[in-house]
Amino acid sequence: RGDNYFAAGGDMRGSNCGVFVGAASMDYGNRNMDDLNVIDPYSATGNTLSIASNRVSYLFDLRGPSMSVDTACSSSLVALHQAVKALQSGEADVALAGGVNLLLHPFGFVSFSKASMLSPRGRCRAFDATGDGYVRSEGGAFVLLKPLDRALADGDTIHAVIAGSGVNSVGHSPGGISVPGAAAQASLLRSVYARAGIDPQSLAYLEAHGTGTAVGDPIEARALIDVVSGERPADRPLLIGSVKTNIGHLETASGMAGLLKAVMCLKHRAVPRSLHFVTPNPGIDFDGGRLRVVDRYMSLDAGDAPLTVGVNSFGFGGTNAHVVLTEAPAANEASTAVPEPIHAQLSPLVLTARSANALGALAGRYLAALDNGGDWQALAAAA
């Protein structure tokens, strides 16, 4: 992680560090371009997507490849794949990869609502029979990537290892450009795991794209059954889940959100519950296809073998991305623990509400949670 690196005094200025940013939203520009009087010399450099990556390279004097990637919802995972390729080819020695999504203009909400993409009930119900769309959310996340041998030699904290990654396209879809394709998704999975030399049936967990749409979820499930889960024994189904049920759909940054969840699953050897899964989608053969949605906290166990997890991410223009992760080397664990910051016990618990009465009621609920043994740090982080 970049914050760990900089906290340890790392300085990458002048280095061959690449920057790869998944970004697509033009909301800020849309808000400001209606009035010609507000356009100034900074309007171009402040609103073009290329600057999202280029400005990071400029501010920190990073000399490697610098590019912004727009493949809609798969942008950040495609950006990570490009970063991996740059490291493998030697174009970069180190790489920052991630994505960002901000919701600042009603355009996307109106358009996606008219396309029946957004949930009228405000819930991402991935793989559930009542799934009726997704909830837009915003955020950003980045990871610092290095070749494994160099990271070990430098004594860096290694959170996980990227064993393989890949990107492809649905191509022409009879249902329209925004309709996913199970055949293309399955083809991508086969190629990624073949190149990585990993049996997909050995996956401990797969973080699905899982938006909770009536069309997308069954299509993704068919691809998973075809390649990853269909040949498993009945007592060892593939565990799947979607972080979108917990934090909403970060769109261009959603692949990175899924990747970070997958990394934490490896580190803790457990998977948190995917929310709002009550009735399995009847369009998915969960039992016959050996799929199980993680509807409660579950431990992961691969026996003596390292845990392996996968991450799916798809764009509504047809660009698919997949990444497979394995656990960090055991030798790294004892020597690379990051010390807890001195201020860790001083994190503020920030509350906000629509009125003073609502704020008081909210504060009361947090007090009750603390009285019942709730962890202050966890509550402060989630508030």
Predicted features along the sequence, with ranges:
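Condensing-enzyme catalytic core of the thiolase-fold
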Residues: R1-H343, S347-P348, A353, N357, ...
